[in-house]
């Protein structure tokens, strides 16, 4: 929005030209989301307490979690509001990929809101009925993916990029829609599963979003993409603004979500942030890189799949409890230790993912 205003004012005041620089807008997007979060946070927490939007806790979970019952949840509303505001302020609103990303973010946020509200209303951890939850997640994903496909079909925007191999970039055609759907829905649920401890999900999200800001810039730059042997995809450079907004909003939320948490993001936040990471990965053609950089999310999801599969087939559990962060809690690890170690793993995987851009 401010890009258009600055462009108009530039003819009268040349100093407004600085707003056209992507790097300047990226930093301002991050700071805007961060400062808005710090300003909104206390007010949001107070409102959630007034409305009695408190967290429900599983009765079969770790005993240390019982004290979390009643902690304000649905703080993800703050995350979505600040990401959206910052993206609209500093992004180029003529860019279709900004709108696709916001559509998934807000669409998944709405689904998460209903899920959270039902948990609070009925005072259990069930939430939205699973089949309806996945139905609406799928509807939002397919609308976004079909739009993205129509924008980029028959171009490098629908090629598959394989890490470590510079010459393997097959054209996906219609399979792009299938792959993109599973990436978006899968990542959304993976982040949702990870959001079980104070700050556990938000910091890896910040790391991955920050890395994707760099990748989006490279993918949208003709010379840099050619140098790195990745496909040049027009429109993606503007996703830097969206990514840095996620970083700023995430850090602002962490201020209140760090152990012991004053507020939880709830499904309204985790489903939306996961969907946002998924759609960014698809748009910059780095689905495989998301698996590497989002390794903590993958690990949490795989632990649940293995636990459920093992119990159904052998009537035995592999872990004391899944997702795997609960396994370590039940082994006696203090919650902050689990969180910080998972953050360290996440940071290492993100750095590894960035290195693979050059190792081809």
Curated annotation (Swiss-Prot):
The chain crosses the membrane at residues 26-46, 73-93, 94-114, 132-152, 168-188, 199-219, 239-259, 263-283, 288-308, 338-358. One of its GO terms (molecular function) is UDP-N-acetylmuramoyl-L-alanyl-D-glutamyl-meso-2,6-diaminopimelyl-D-alanyl-D-alanine:undecaprenyl-phosphate transferase activity. Its EC number is 2.7.8.13. It is found in: Cell inner membrane. Its main location: membrane. Pathway: Cell wall biogenesis; peptidoglycan biosynthesis. It is a multi-pass membrane protein. Keywords: Cell cycle, Cell division, Cell inner membrane, Cell membrane, Cell shape, Cell wall biogenesis/degradation, Magnesium, Membrane, Metal-binding, Peptidoglycan synthesis, Transferase, Transmembrane, Transmembrane helix. GO terms for cellular component: plasma membrane. The keyword Lyase does not apply. The keyword Cell membrane applies. It comes from the Bacteria. GO terms for biological process: cell division; cell wall organization; peptidoglycan biosynthetic process; regulation of cell shape. Its cofactor is Mg(2+). Belongs to the glycosyltransferase 4 family. MraY subfamily. Catalyzes the initial step of the lipid cycle reactions in the biosynthesis of the cell wall peptidoglycan: transfers peptidoglycan precursor phospho-MurNAc-pentapeptide from UDP-MurNAc-pentapeptide onto the lipid carrier undecaprenyl phosphate, yielding undecaprenyl-pyrophosphoryl-MurNAc-pentapeptide, known as lipid I. This is Phospho-N-acetylmuramoyl-pentapeptide-transferase. It comes from Actinobacillus succinogenes (strain ATCC 55618 / DSM 22257 / CCUG 43843 / 130Z). The gene is mraY.
């Amino acid at each position: 929005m401010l890009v258009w205003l600055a462009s108009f004012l530039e003819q009268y005041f040349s100093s407004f030209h600085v707003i056209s620089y992507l790097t300047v807008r990226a930093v301002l997007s991050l700071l805007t989301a961060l400062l808005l979060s710090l300003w909104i946070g206390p007010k949001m927490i107070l409102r959630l307490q007034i409305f009695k939007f408190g967290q429900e806790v599983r009765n079969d979970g770790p005993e240390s979690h019982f004290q979390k019952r009643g902690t304000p949840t649905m703080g993800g509303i703050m995350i979505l509001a600040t990401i959206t505001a910052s993206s609209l302020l500093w992004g180029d609103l003529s860019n279709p990929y900004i709108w696709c990303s916001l559509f998934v973010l807000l669409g998944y946020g709405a689904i998460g809101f209903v899920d959270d509200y039902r948990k609070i209303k009925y005072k259990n951890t069930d939430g939205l009925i699973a089949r309806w939850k996945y139905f609406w997640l799928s509807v939002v994903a397919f609308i976004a993916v079909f739009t993205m496909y129509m924008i980029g079909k028959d171009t490098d925007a629908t090629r598959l990029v394989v890490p470590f191999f510079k010459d393997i970039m097959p054209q996906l055609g219609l399979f792009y829609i299938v792959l993109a759907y599973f990436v978006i829905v899968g990542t959304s649920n993976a982040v949702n599963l990870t959001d079980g401890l104070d700050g556990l999900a938000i910091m890896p999200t910040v790391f991955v979003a920050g890395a994707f800001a760099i990748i989006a810039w490279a993918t949208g730059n003709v010379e840099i993409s050619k140098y790195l042997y990745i496909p040049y995809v027009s429109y993606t450079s503007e996703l830097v603004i969206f990514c840095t907004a996620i970083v700023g909003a995430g850090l602002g939320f962490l201020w209140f979500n760090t152990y012991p948490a004053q507020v939880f993001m709830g499904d309204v936040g985790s489903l939306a942030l996961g969907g946002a990471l998924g759609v960014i990965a698809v748009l910059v053609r780095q689905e495989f890189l998301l698996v590497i950089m989002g390794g903590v999310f993958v690990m949490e999801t795989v632990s649940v799949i293995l636990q459920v599969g093992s119990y159904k087939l052998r009537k035995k559990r592999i872990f004391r409890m899944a997702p795997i962060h609960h396994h370590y809690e039940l082994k006696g690890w203090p919650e902050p230790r689990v969180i910080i170690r998972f953050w360290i793993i996440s940071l290492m995987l993100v750095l590894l993912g960035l290195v693979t851009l050059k190792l081809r």
